[in-house]
Amino acid sequence: MDLSFKPEHETFRDEVRKFLKDELTEELLEAGKLTASVFSEVEFSSKWHKILYKKGWIGASWPEEYGGTGWDDMQRYIFRSECASAGTPSPTAMGLAMVGPVLMKHGTQKQKDFYLPRILSGEDFWCQGYSEPGSGSDLASLQCKAVRDGDHYLVNGTKIWTTH
């Protein structure tokens, strides 16, 4: 098995390194260092997300038909590896890694057309809010309710762990 980079992958790695050098401000690098989990603080995640979106690099694992990069496996590896080495903050991951792929597979065409571009651009922000006092993440015992109130929903309840 040959795991060496092809010349086009070396060129791509150089491009990624230059991009990171040019775009990573001290503020973003500091935010990357302070990341306590897989998620960076929202302010910095959003900034980094928008920089990647402007470059056309936010949808690294999304199919091209939904606005993804069209990168091969090696390019995705190079990009993620270089971002990790550089200490970037994470982009807003919930929409990119969880909501977007579910919509791609199970969403209606109308949902895909509306939400997927907004996830990529960072215009829409998604989060997960499962855990509740006394329930943890046991989804069958959750007490929080959403009730339609005109053209929106009123959500009542308490969450103890929410992530973006």
Summary of predicted features, one role per range:
Residues G32-E41, E64-G68, V99-K105, S131-G134:
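Conserved short loop/turn motifs at secondary-structure junctions
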Residues K18-L24, L52-K54:
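N-terminal glycine-rich anion-binding loops that anchor highly charged ligand groups
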Residues M1-R13:
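Intrinsic disorder at enzyme termini
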Residues L28, S90-L96, W126-E132:
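Core alpha/beta catalytic barrel or barrel-like domain that forms the active/cofactor pocket
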Residues S46-E123, H164:
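Internal helix-loop-helix
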Residues H9, L20, G56, P63, ...:
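Buried hydrophobic positions in well-ordered alpha/beta secondary-structure cores of metabolic enzymes
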Residues G68-T69, K110-H164:
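Glycine-rich, Trp-frequent "lid" loop and neighboring beta-strands that shape
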